[in-house]
């Protein structure tokens, strides 16, 4: 199988790729290397720090877009798989759906949107932030809420 893994969180995609390659699959990882952790990847999609960093990353994504097609499975690490604005994500997602067999959304890592969604709409019966309709009051849940929502 041909598998594309987009994004990275705590070495999940890099180690998954290594295991899948051992099993004989063709795997490509495109990520920002999870920032300072510098995990391995095949296509580096790191956003710089300059005033034009977002534009440069967008150009890099467009330049590599042809490499993101004809896969049996594409897994994105979470809804914010690139350090770009949401409208750019929508364009990339449409391309991925059109040019690949299956698209899988992971829920790795944590970001503002994940925390907010789990607190407000509670799409999961059990999450880091809720048990059923009840918001979790434990220390870890409170720390994560403060870190991401202020």
Language model: regions and residue ranges:
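Membrane-proximal helix-turn-helix segments that form the acceptor-binding/catalytic region
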Residues: 68-69, 91-98, 123-150
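Glycine-rich, highly charged phosphate/nucleotide-binding loops
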Residues: 47-67
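Short, solvent-exposed beta-strand-terminating loops
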Residues: 30-38, 104-123
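Short N-terminal targeting/anchoring amphipathic segment
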Residues: 2-6, 65-88, 102-106
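Short, hinge-like loop/turn segments at secondary-structure boundaries
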Residues: 45-48, 121-125
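Short alpha-helical segments and helix-capping/turn motifs at coil-helix boundaries
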Residues: 11-15, 58-62, 87-96, 142-147
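Short, flexible loop segments at the rims of nucleotide/cofactor-binding pockets, characterized by
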Residues: 50-56, 82, 133-141
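N-terminal subdomain of nucleotide-sugar transferases
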Residues: 1-41, 99-101
């Amino acid at each position: 199988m041909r598998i594309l893994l987009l994004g990275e969180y705590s070495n999940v995609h890099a180690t998954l790729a290594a295991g899948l390659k051992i099993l004989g699959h063709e795997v490509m990882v495109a990520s920002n290397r999870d920032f300072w952790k510098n995990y391995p990847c095949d296509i580096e999609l790191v956003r710089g720090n300059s005033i034009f960093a977002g534009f440069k990353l967008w150009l890099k994504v467009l330049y590599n877009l042809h490499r993101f097609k004809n896969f049996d499975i594409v897994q994105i690490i979470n809804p914010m798989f690139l350090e770009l604005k949401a409208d750019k994500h929508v364009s990339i997602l449409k391309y991925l759906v059109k040019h690949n067999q299956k698209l899988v959304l992971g829920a790795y890592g944590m970001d503002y949107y994940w925390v907010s969604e789990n607190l407000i709409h509670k799409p999961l019966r059990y999450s880091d932030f809720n048990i059923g309709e009840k918001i979790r009051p434990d220390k870890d849940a409170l720390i994560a809420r403060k870190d991401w929502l202020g």
